[in-house]
Structure formats: structure tokens, C-alpha cells
């Protein structure tokens, strides 16, 4: 049986573990206690994690009784999550209107809402123009959706770098002066996250005797690789750009930089960030496939904490992690 003292000691070790002070940390220190964790931290915990999790678990458990399809379940989950996010954002902003955007918390709350609205707007535009009415255009539709997502996330990145104090300068200085420290640490966290994460996930589904298959998020992204023709290669290039370069930076700004600032307690931030990262990747509502994303989010959170709140480390670690996944996905298409 695990003693409570052992758990406390473990979390204290996580809290205190970090790289040595370097010039970038002294010039642009990250404030892990920007807000009050018992107030602002709880707003984030409940609006972005607890309420969405309760909702998606309830929908999955009672799906048969409620007589809802997988598509409708995903839609209900997305709409309810946006509602919880909006309420949380209003409460948080009413308490901290001056720092809401500069701290990055506004981006944390705004990201899922903006992504949905941006995708909806361009989806409606495509339907109005009638570009993808023909069934033969499914492959081009996938490319279009990937392009829309890429543009949306690039806009979030640009906005974040322009609003969050010193973020752009800190990242530039880290890459310029600390590459010898940054790259090995990022690779180490990526490798550990990938292999430990996949091992733990396999153990979980084996012990629980689950036959989950591929997550709907992963399935939706990978299925266009099976299409023949030029569209397959266009999609592949866009997929690599989004997955390895754009998405890791955007998601780390949201799930680490902004969330750690808002929660303002290192240990609680690691827990909340890991769960939130999982929720971000189950928009279809398949909660049983949340585990690998939560585990990955946990290691990226550790990278952020270990680097004293330096976005560059968890971002690069996330990129390397995704690169491993992309290489394996593409290799599986050609190696039988």
C-alpha cells in the first residue's frame, strides 16, 4: 500500500526538480504563482477539466439509454465544453480584466472556442461555394480542413506571441543561447513520453480488457493517407507541417504556458494540464482513448516544470514526440 507521505515526497520531488539557472531564466523568469490557485486555479480546473470530463463520461456510460449516435455524442460534448469554457472565461475575466490576455489565460479559454468558430465559418463557406459537393472531392475536403486548422493555429500562435509578455523574446533567446541544453532535454522527454506512455497505455487496456482500437482523433487524421493519387501526398506534406511544427507550439502555448500561469500551483498545474491535454484530443467524445494523450501531456508538463516554465522545452519535446509518431505512421503505409 502506498503511504501518503510517499506521495507527498514524490510530488515535492517533481515540484523541486529543475535545470540550473541560466541567463534566459534570470532575464525572463516564469511566475508559477501569478494568480491564486484556490480561486483562479479552481475556475480553470472546473470549467476546462472536471465539468467536461463528467459530461463526456456520462454521455459514454448512458449512450444506449439516451439513444444517441457517436456523432451526436461528439457534438453534445463539444457544445457543452464550449459552454463551460465560456462561463469559466467570463468568471475569470471579471476577476482579472487587466491581466486576462497579457498573462495568456485569455488564450487558454479562447483557443477551443476560436478553433470551433473558425472551422465552422470556413466549413459553411465551402458549402456555400459548393466546392466539395461531389463525393470525389472527399480527399480535397480533408486537405481543406487540415489547411483551415493550420491557419487557425498559426493565428493563435501569432496572437500569443504578440500578447503574452516577453514570450517571443524568451523563446528566441533560448534557441539562440541554449541549444546544447535544449535539444538533448527535449529529445529525452519525447522518447520517455513516447515509450513509457505507450507501455502504460498497453498495460491499462490489457488490465481493463478493453478493445479500443485507434482513437477517432487519430483515425480522422490518418485515414486520408489510404487514398490513392496526388491528394495523398499533398495531405501528407500538410499533415507533417501541422503535426510536427504548428500544432505542438500552439498546444504548448495553451496547455502549458497559459494554463500553468492561470492555475498558479506547480503540482496542480501538472495534473490539470495533463487532463486538459487529453480532453483537447477527444473532441469526438471517445473518452476511452484519452489515456495516451493524458500520459503525453503529463510528460510535456514535466518538461515545462523542469525547465522552470520555459515554453521552448515542452514545445520541442512535443514536436519530437509527434515526429516519432508521424514516421511510424508513414512507415506503416509502406512496410507490410
Curated annotation (Swiss-Prot):
Top-level taxonomy: Bacteria, Bacillati, Mycoplasmatota, Mollicutes, Mycoplasmataceae
Annotated GO MF terms: endopeptidase activity
Protein name per the record: Uncharacterized protein MCAP_0715
Organism (species): Mycoplasma capricolum subsp. capricolum (strain California kid / ATCC 27343 / NCTC 10154)
UniProt signal peptide: none
BP GO terms, sorted: CAAX-box protein maturation
Entry-linked Pfam families: Rce1-like
InterPro entries attached to this UniProt entry: CAAX_protease, Rce1/LyrA-like_dom
Amino acid at each position: 500500500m502506498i503511504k501518503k507521505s510517499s506521495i507527498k515526497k514524490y510530488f515535492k520531488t517533481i515540484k523541486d526538480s529543475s535545470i540550473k539557472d541560466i541567463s534566459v531564466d534570470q532575464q525572463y523568469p516564469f511566475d508559477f504563482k501569478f494568480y491564486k490557485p484556490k480561486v483562479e486555479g479552481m475556475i480553470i480546473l472546473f470549467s476546462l477539466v472536471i465539468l467536461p470530463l463528467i459530461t463526456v463520461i456520462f454521455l459514454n456510460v448512458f449512450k444506449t439509454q439516451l439513444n444517441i449516435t457517436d456523432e451526436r455524442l461528439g457534438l453534445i460534448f463539444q457544445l457543452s465544453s464550449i459552454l463551460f469554457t465560456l462561463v469559466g472565461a467570463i468568471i475569470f475575466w471579471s476577476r482579472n480584466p487587466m491581466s486576462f490576455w497579457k498573462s495568456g489565460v485569455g488564450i487558454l479559454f479562447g483557443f477551443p472556442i476560436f478553433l470551433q468558430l473558425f472551422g465552422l465559418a470556413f466549413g459553411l463557406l465551402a458549402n456555400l461555394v459548393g466546392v466539395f459537393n461531389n463525393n470525389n472531392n472527399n480527399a480535397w475536403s480533408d486537405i481543406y480542413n487540415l489547411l483551415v486548422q493550420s491557419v487557425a493555429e498559426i493565428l493563435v500562435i501569432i496572437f500569443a506571441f504578440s500578447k503574452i509578455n516577453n514570450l517571443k523574446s524568451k523563446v528566441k533567446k533560448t534557441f539562440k543561447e541554449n541549444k546544447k541544453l535544449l535539444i538533448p532535454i527535449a529529445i529525452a522527454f519525447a522518447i520517455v513520453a513516447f515509450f513509457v506512455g505507450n507501455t502504460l497505455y498497453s498495460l491499462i487496456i490489457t488490465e481493463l480488457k478493453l478493445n479500443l482500437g485507434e482513437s477517432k482523433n487519430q483515425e480522422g487524421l490518418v485515414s486520408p493517407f489510404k487514398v490513392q493519387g496526388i491528394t495523398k501526398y499533398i495531405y501528407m506534406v500538410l499533415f507533417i507541417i501541422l503535426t510536427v511544427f504548428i500544432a505542438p507550439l500552439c498546444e504548448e502555448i495553451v496547455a502549458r504556458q497559459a494554463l500553468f500561469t492561470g492555475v498558479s500551483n506547480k503540482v496542480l498545474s501538472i495534473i490539470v494540464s495533463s487532463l486538459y491535454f487529453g480532453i483537447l484530443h477527444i473532441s469526438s467524445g471517445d473518452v476511452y482513448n484519452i489515456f495516451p494523450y493524458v500520459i503525453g501531456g503529463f510528460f510535456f508538463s514535466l518538461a515545462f516544470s523542469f525547465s522552470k516554465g520555459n515554453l521552448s522545452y515542452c514545445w520541442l519535446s512535443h514536436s519530437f514526440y509527434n515526429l516519432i509518431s508521424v514516421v511510424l505512421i508513414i512507415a506503416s503505409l509502406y512496410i507490410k
